[in-house]
Amino acid sequence: MSMNNIPQSTTLSDTTAGTSCFDANHIDVTTIEDLEQVGSDKWTRYPGCIGAFIAEMDYGLAPCVAEAIEEATERGALGYIPDPWKKEVARSCAAWQRRYGWEVDPTCIRPVPDVLEAFEVFLREIVRAGNSIVVPTPAYMPFLSVPRLYGVEVLEIPMLCAGAGESSGRNDEWLFDFDAIEQAFANGCHAFVLCNPHNPIGKVLTREEMLRLSDLAAKYDVRIFSDEIHAPFVYQGHTHVPFASINRQTAMQAFTSTSASKSFNIPGTKCAQVILTNPDDLELWMRNAEWSEHQTATIGAIATTAAYDGGAAWFEGVMAYIERNIALVNEQMRTRFAKVRYVEPQGTYIAWLDFSPLGIGDPANYFFKKANVALTDGRECGEVGRGCVRMNFAMPYPLLEECFDRMAVALEADGLL
């Protein structure tokens, strides 16, 4: 291999690890027009609308990531992903997992274009056509649609909202319906989707909840697909615990996938990771998932390694900004939008808003037409999503204020607030 193709991540991390370079003031003055000029789907699909549907942030790139991408393009490192970069991704991902107290063997980590590709391998190779999978709802939309492409039946099991009433409640909490889950397992379902932190409700599971799930899985020989892409986005009072890290039983049950794409806003670079703590899964992966690795982008491996190695300080700046935003969301839902059902997220940068108490059957369409706000239709997240929307609040703070203003004006005009 030539010198130009040897990973340069160590040098990059040495120069960037100690500086944040996250400029909140710059984010605050970013306009809709500025974001449309960037050209993302989030801000160009519906011109003039506030984009609050696609789950990506509007905070630019960490300097270490931008520098790594620039250097890679200058030296023409845009070919198929070579083994040295696969190993760098594994090494840096394993190092990042230590944030959660998880010591992972890098040889268990393989590159994949995105978490959904990992999910597809799980469906194809482990669940297999003719079987079923439990998906707690509301759910990330593809978890409901993709299994059917592989002949796998989706069993929607609605989450329970403990303490939910007609208005927001700071003590409300989302819970798994373990009785319904066990019934599904007893009836022959052998797979479960665990999204933690959960998209779209923002729940962060406790160790005790995951142990209860694991014990049920052990009783009925169930495998767990663990999507942990939102792991860094956890608010004060809550802790992300990787499912596979708890004990040997969970490690053998888990098929974990994660990525730097949410934390560092690089989903378009196409590099996620699958963490295979069950040796049989690793053997299966090496035998049957070669083309999934082959589709992983070299530029994504470079960006991911730079992010994991050198982006921690920048990400802390991002989290401080998002915590300011979630404080605004919580305040708005307690005051102007008190009639809307809402449970404060424990993690992620996504809020789940239930407008059914206001008699709005299709709030996504309502706010798109009456407020120029683009939200995700809750029905895409499962049967329980009727009357609900998913809101991405990882945008400039002033635009988030404007988003709520637009929505409130529309509702007030119709006498609904």
What positions do the PLM features span?
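Short Gly/Ser/Thr- and Asp/Glu-enriched loop/turn motifs at secondary-structure junctions
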Residues: 105-106, 344-349, 386
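Conserved core of the PLP fold type I
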Residues: 77-215, 232-233, 240-249, 255, ...
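Conserved glycine-rich beta-strand-loop-beta hairpin in the small C-terminal domain of fold type I
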Residues: 305, 321-330, 342-354
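Conserved core segment of the aminotransferase class I/II
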Residues: 4-13, 248-323, 331-332, 409-411
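N-terminal small-domain helix-loop-helix segment of the aminotransferase-like
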Residues: 7, 15-114, 121, 307-310, ...
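PLP-dependent enzyme catalytic core of the Aspartate aminotransferase-like
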Residues: 2, 182, 250, 366-375, ...
